[in-house]
Amino acid sequence: MKILIVDVFGAVNSTGKITTLQYRYMKSRGHEVRVCYRGVREPRIDNPDYVPVAGKLEPGVGRLLSWVTGYEGFCHPLATKRLIQYTQSFHPDIVQLNILHGYFINSHQYIRFLNDHHYRVCYTMMDEYAYMGKCPYSFSCNQFLTGCTGGCPEQKHYPKSFFFDRSAVIWQAKERAYRGFEHIVFTGPGWVVDRARRSQLLRGFDIRELDEPVDFGTTFHPREVQALRTRLNIPATHKVIVTVAQMSNPRKGGIYFLQAAELLARQEDLTFVFVGYDVKQPVTLPHVVTVPYVSSQEELAQYYALGDLFVCTSLADTMPNVCIEALGCGTPLAGFAEAGTPYVAPSAYATFTKTYDIPALAQVIASTPKKSPERSAACHQYAVGRYAGEVIFAKLEKIYQSLIQQ
């Protein structure tokens, strides 16, 4: 079959990793696959099957217009036109939608086009954008249950608007785009699926639970980390507690990892490693090692494998890939029972506390044992059995086949 994947990212950045896995798997199955992506703010992809739809200037101009007018997803006519034209010329059997925000297309316009022209569509919900107004994450807002009517508590946050709350207008545009769409299936992890089924926008649509895949075979697996441990000057007797998060993004919750480390400052057998620490303010705690953003997936896997425990204090992730990747590298999990995080693994491999309960999180960290080879192998086996690309994409391929048969 002919498959067109649409995602803001095409390669290693964020959901681009999943897009790349989708592309490779479907190609290996003999399908004809193309990827339409934004094409800026990530490394160039030298593959003719990858088609950038946004020019070099349009994403930036559209972002500024969105900030000023509040019309997120309305300010990218040229990229949207290119995407529609490419879809018409390629004429796919399946259109696979991933992340449609990120200042690169008018998503409601494209979905309306797909609806009007009777394309078969699978929309994978890697966040909550499919059933929200302008927002990719709901946080404490429940307007998605009844429809966005204004008064958006996230107006000044991504995708932000300096002056105007257009959330109701954007929600209405999505509602019109979805209306009467017969040949669309929505997929996503359990937490997202539950909310999508209750949402005003997607209530009554075909919504199926599907986890997000990770590349365990070539990258995220247990490995020898003594060289990294030596380079970071971590004593052999210390337990290593790792997080991977963008410190400058409050949604990732890095501050709570540091607060837990501060509570445990007197425990002499712990070293905390914060990967993704991208702010200028130094960490003064002597038992905390900060590492800036790591772009190499191989190096990132070493940090995951280094940990005796991986901590995730994210406040909004629907299915935190960092947790799945850490499990694949043989490291058990701890963190907040927030959003989709507790859906990642059962209690045999993870311990989650009430959100913001730093003393409880610190207690979990303090009591964690050093990781044994048997523990590492068990974590890896669970991750592979549930999240391996061949497992997820075999299910996705069956969804494609069911759409074509409609």
List the model feature ranges, each with a label.
Residues 332-335:
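Short hydrophobic beta-strand element within catalytic cores of glycosyltransferases
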Residues 276-301:
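Nucleotide-activated donor-binding/catalytic signature segment of Leloir-type glycosyltransferases, i.e.
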Residues 315:
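Aromatic "clamp/platform" in nucleotide-sugar-dependent glycosyltransferases that forms part
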Residues 347-358, 366-371:
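Conserved acidic donor-binding segment of nucleotide-sugar-dependent glycosyltransferases
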Residues 373-386, 395-398:
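A short, well-ordered alpha-helix in the C-terminal region of glycosyltransferases
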Residues 214, 235-252, 258-261:
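Conserved donor-binding/catalytic core segment of Leloir-type glycosyltransferases
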Residues 130, 145-225:
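Donor nucleotide-sugar binding/catalytic pocket of nucleotide-sugar-dependent glycosyltransferases
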Residues 302-307:
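Short alpha-helical donor nucleotide-sugar binding micro-motif in glycosyltransferases
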